[in-house]
Amino acid sequence: MEVINHIAALKVSLRSARLAQQKIALVPTMGALHSGHVSLVKKAQELADIVVCSIFVNPTQFTDPKDLEKYPRPLEHDIRMLEHAGCDFVFMPSVTEMYPEPENWHIDLGPAEFLLEGEFRKGHYQGVTQIVKKLFDAVNPDLAFFGQKDYQQVL
């Protein structure tokens, strides 16, 4: 398993898989992994040739800075879990890698942005959609696997 911290290095590492027309799967996470994440990796392995799991605690989806500060980051544990699960690549970028400059863009999510969890966490889904787009741009996956707790995000 290869741990990668930079988008350019990730693209280089995935180039041979692309040239061989292998299917690439992305399992995006914020870390603090558990058996549910491992099950997503296993499902990705069934349907793709290469599995990339990202670990990135995205500051733009936290409305309260204290929540961001308190978010658990057991990186050694997470890496061991992914290695044991047989993940091919772990993409662990820094905040400056994903957000090199301040950004001010908006994705129109329609009314879904303000329903359910969005009603109580203003701006949360903008942050989620921004990082998912950035991860998709970095990995360019054929498949992506999200957990059940991300139901509203999938909508």
PLM regions with names:
Residues 2-155:
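Nucleotidyltransferase catalytic core that binds NTPs
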